[in-house]
């Protein structure tokens, strides 16, 4: 588990489990978590790591409704949690099935997942939301369906960093599941906007050239 400082006050936290990458953006008044981890225990570890960097009040954005990105939320206590409505609905109504599937697939996870309360996001990202963290405005954007119907990306314009969730994966091909819309996904990757550093939901941070190559790979799969 390691912190990567991508720019002033912008961090990615890399985890060996599932090659997961979480994010943290600091302002002068509050901080933003980008996803919260795979389960309550993982979330608690993430919360402790964040508190080693900052005591600022936190809010979270969930990039999409898959369990490995949001089941850590309960560890942070009451806090504002942003997501697209489709992701919030998936979290509310689909997490039990996801947990059952992964507990059967990887039984070592079953107990930890069973002890992880589901926290449904309470703030909506329909198109664009600007969050003022104090001295820095972060943009939450829904650019259309892709990896899931409710993907949200997080742009930190002053730092040239974009958190892409599972719209981008490094170290493995993009995960095209039954809830993916590949044709729309290709278009979404073309609309990410300028960013020097793109942080995938799994894997190490990449550049725009990597994103373009992955976009071409997806286009070939349509």
Predicted regions and their residues:
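A short catalytic or substrate-binding loop motif that flags glycine-/basic-rich loops and adjacent residues
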Residues: 15-17, 124, 144-149
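Conserved beta-strand hairpin/beta-sheet module of binuclear metal-dependent hydrolase folds
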Residues: 3-49, 152-166
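Active-site metal-binding motif and surrounding structural segment of the metallo-beta-lactamase
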Residues: 28, 40-86, 194-196
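Metallo-beta-lactamase
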Residues: 5, 31-32, 36-40, 89-215
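Divalent metal-coordination and catalytic microenvironments
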Residues: 9, 25, 35, 50, ...
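Short amphipathic alpha-helical segments
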Residues: 45-47, 73-75, 94-95, 176, ...
